[in-house]
């Protein structure tokens, strides 16, 4: 069993590495998406703020917590800002969250981990509840993928068909 445990640890490390590689790609996509959106609605320093927001989402939602408190006052108070611009910036963020949560992350992470769209979304909810919001959201996909792979390995090793 020592060999089996070592093999599963290697599998888990591989899952973590590939997860963070894909998460980096997602963050870059989000950065360009938010940056372009903020720039298009006329937010001062919009591309920079949006890009930083996307990249900081390596820890899920961290970029939003840090960047929205900067972006929203800028949209309202700087260079003829208005409630309209503030709502446009907020709209870009909401639309980006929708795209990320339902399409970008599930597609990129779900296809490679074997979890699928629903599995990715469920894993976020489950692990955020079990480990807390920050650690749970950060490790949700690698932990779920490892659980699936471990289950398959244990099933193949210990469960024999009856028929």
Regions found by a protein language model. Give the residues of each.
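Membrane-embedded alpha-helical segments of multi-pass transporters/permeases
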Residues: 31, 35, 39, 76, ...
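Alpha-helical transmembrane segments and their immediate interhelical loop/hinge regions
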Residues: 1-74, 83-86
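Canonical bilayer-spanning transmembrane alpha-helix
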Residues: 37-56, 107-155
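Alpha-helical transmembrane segments
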Residues: 76-88, 93, 97-115, 156-163
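Alpha-helical transmembrane segments of multipass membrane proteins
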Residues: 26, 30-34, 96-100, 132, ...
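Hydrophobic alpha-helical segments typical of transmembrane helices
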Residues: 4, 32, 103-108, 122
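Hydrophobic transmembrane alpha-helices
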Residues: 52-62, 69-77, 91-99, 126-130, ...
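Internal alpha-helical transmembrane segments of multi-pass membrane proteins, especially GPCRs
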Residues: 17, 21, 87-91, 122-123, ...
């Amino acid at each position: 069993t020592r060999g089996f445990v070592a093999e599963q640890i290697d599998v888990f490390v591989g899952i973590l590495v590939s997860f963070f590689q894909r998460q980096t790609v997602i963050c870059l996509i989000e950065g360009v998406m938010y940056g372009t959106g903020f720039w298009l609605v006329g937010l001062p320093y919009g591309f920079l703020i949006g890009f930083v927001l996307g990249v900081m989402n390596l820890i899920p939602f961290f970029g939003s917590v840090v960047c929205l408190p900067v972006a929203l006052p800028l949209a309202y108070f700087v260079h003829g800002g208005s409630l309209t611009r503030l709502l446009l910036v907020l709209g870009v963020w909401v639309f980006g969250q929708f795209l990320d949560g339902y399409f970008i992350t599930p597609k990129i992470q779900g296809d490679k981990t074997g979890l699928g769209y629903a599995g990715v979304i469920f894993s976020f909810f489950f692990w955020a509840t079990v480990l807390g919001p920050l650690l749970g959201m950060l490790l949700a996909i690698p932990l779920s993928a490892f659980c699936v792979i471990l289950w398959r390995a244990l099933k193949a090793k210990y469960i024999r068909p009856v028929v």
